[in-house]
Regions:
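Hydrophobic, aromatic-rich transmembrane alpha-helices
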Residues: 18-23, 137, 351-400
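Transmembrane-helix signature of polytopic, membrane-embedded enzymes
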Residues: 123, 140-165
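Transmembrane-helix motifs of polytopic, lipid-linked glycan transferases
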Residues: 19-25, 127-149, 383-387
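Loop-to-helix entry region of an early transmembrane alpha helix in multi-pass inner-membrane enzymes
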Residues: 101-112, 117-135
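Membrane-interface alpha helices of multi-pass inner-membrane proteins
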Residues: 170-171, 204-230, 236, 241-244, ...
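Extracytoplasmic catalytic/substrate-binding loops of multi-pass membrane glycan-assembly enzymes
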Residues: 56-86, 95-110, 120, 352, ...
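Membrane-interfacial entry segments at the cytosolic side of transmembrane helices
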Residues: 31-37, 205-215, 248-264
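Membrane-interface helix-loop-helix junctions at transmembrane boundaries of multi-pass membrane enzymes
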Residues: 27, 146, 154, 201-213, ...
């Protein structure tokens, strides 16, 4: 029985996983050969990097010895050992053995289930990351196929290239870390919101079918993300509030249906947040306890203070080289203090740290490898933002967009930027958390995509239709008008 459980079953499951990854890449290549090549290249680089890093650390080879952290692990991913050990114990002894207060319990439980099928090797966690990477690429491409034909490939290339080429995401994909898993469900959340935000120009039957897909996607995504990073779905729920306001203000047809869909998603999201985990519920309690602007600042200062107290080699100090984190010795209760801390935080998010140090704006005492990786990732992130902005601007000149979804995407990006810039003072943590901010940019062009056909439903807008600025079609004969 043990032979079947821990040898034959993992071998069979691993073979099926490989077949699934190959088929997914073939499907993407069938949609666009260039996209297929890009995704396959990203997958190949991740496999090669994961194998190299694993064996270097496992065999204690004399390569980057100071960064190695045991058999198969690295110091730049300290929490990976904790996730791995909890998941192995859960796979062997049952999920009930995972402590209720465990960090990112939903991810640990998912990893334990995965290891019970594929084996308890460290590399099993990496294979899960590879599946999440390919799945995220496929999800982006599936939605963006609704763009006009001549815009689809170039737009999808921007999003998929940003996902595939992010140095930080590439690194965390090679470790037993939660980021790839989390980002898949974060993109799923945006896809679900896109489905819910689209029906205002469609017949009621098509709108209900979109809702039948969108609400479960939003609920599932919130349940999972609440158990990984509980603050993210809380922020997304607030962004959905802005989307709902936009829908009500703009819609002229079926506005009650659209408002009901958005309201249902918010209610379901709140319930899902409660079910997600105790950690997720803790963030929800904080959110609902806020009554005044003073409560907001008190909560944010408390979160920021936790990073300041934690310290660390990559905690940012001011240009004078103070030992504390940025703003630790300043009066951040004042408007000027908050503005100064915020401006330094924004600079740290979007400007390479080496340049900030050269200008004496910030100072860090250590973390050389993480700083180098962070600088490269910052440059790539900036390029991605500019490319997305240019593509969005060009699309809006020719394709009728979904303004409510754009409101959601922009408000989500702005809230994430403001909160991370003020709260997170540790550069190493900030660079990893910045991957959350990439999600609204990867998915921003969803606003211009349409579903050509719903399961079992009538054709809606053809994917190759191009709309003029007034909303009339210039290709095809549907002639849908903007409402």
């Amino acid at each position: 029985m043990q032979l079947i459980r821990w040898v034959l079953l993992p071998s069979l499951t691993s073979a099926l996983v490989v077949i699934g990854l190959v088929q997914a890449c073939r499907w993407i290549a069938g949609v666009s050969p260039r996209l297929g090549l890009l995704v396959a290249a990203g997958l190949g680089v991740r496999v090669a990097a994961a194998l190299g890093l694993f064996w270097i650390s496992y065999l204690h080879l004399p390569i980057l010895s100071s960064l190695q952290n045991g058999p198969g692990f690295w110091r730049m991913a300290l929490d990976s050992q904790g996730y791995y050990r909890l998941a192995v114990y859960g796979a062997e002894q049952g999920l009930s053995t995972i402590p209720p207060g465990a960090s990112s319990r939903t991810y640990v439980a998912a990893l334990a289930l995965w290891m019970s099928l594929t084996g308890t090797s460290v590399f099993s966690g990496v294979v899960l990351n590879l599946c999440c990477y390919v799945g995220t690429c496929a999800l982006l491409i599936a939605v963006l196929r609704g763009l006009p034909a001549r815009w689809f490939e170039r737009t999808a290339m921007v999003s998929v290239a940003a996902l595939s080429a992010s140095p930080m995401l590439l690194f965390v994909s090679t470790q037993v870390l939660k980021d790839s898993f989390f980002l898949f469900f974060a993109v799923l959340l945006n896809a679900g919101v896109w489905l819910l935000a689209a029906p205002m120009a469609e017949r009621a039957s098509s709108a209900w079918k979109r809702m039948a897909l969108g609400v479960p996607a939003v609920v599932a995504a919130i349940v999972v993300t609440a158990g990984v990073r509980g603050y993210y779905p809380a922020i997304a729920v607030v962004a959905c509030g802005f989307l709902l306001i936009s829908l009500i203000l703009r819609s002229r047809r079926h506005y009650l249906v659209v408002a009901l869909a958005a309201a249902l998603s918010l209610v379901a999201g709140a319930g899902a947040l409660r079910l997600g985990s105790e950690a997720g519920m803790a963030y929800f309690r904080v959110l609902t306890s806020i009554r005044t602007p003073a409560d907001v600042m008190k909560t944010l200062r408390g979160a920021r203070g936790a990073f300041i107290v934690a310290g660390g080699a990559t905690n940012v100090a001011d240009g004078l080289g103070d030992a504390g984190a940025i703003g630790a010795h300043r009066d951040t209760d004042s408007v000027a203090g908050v503005a100064e801390a915020m401006s330094i935080g924004v600079a740290t998010m979007f400007v390479p740290l080496t340049l900030l140090q050269a200008l004496s704006i910030v100072h860090v005492s250590g973390g050389g490898a993480m700083r180098a990786l962070g600088d490269i990732d910052t440059v790539c992130f900036d390029i991605m933002m500019v490319a997305t902005a240019v593509m969005t601007w060009r699309l809006r000149r020719e394709v009728r967009g979904n303004a409510p979804y754009m409101v959601f995407s922009i408000s989500l990006a702005l809230m994430l930027t403001v909160l991370m810039a003020y709260i997170v003072t540790n550069v190493g943590t900030l660079v990893r958390l910045r991957l959350m901010l990439a999600v609204p940019f990867w998915t921003m062009t969803f606003a211009f995509a349409r579903l050509p056909r719903l399961v079992g439903g009538d054709a809606i807008d053809q994917p190759n239709e191009v709309f003029d600025r007034r909303g009339a079609t210039t290709a095809g004969s549907i002639g849908t008008k903007q409402v």
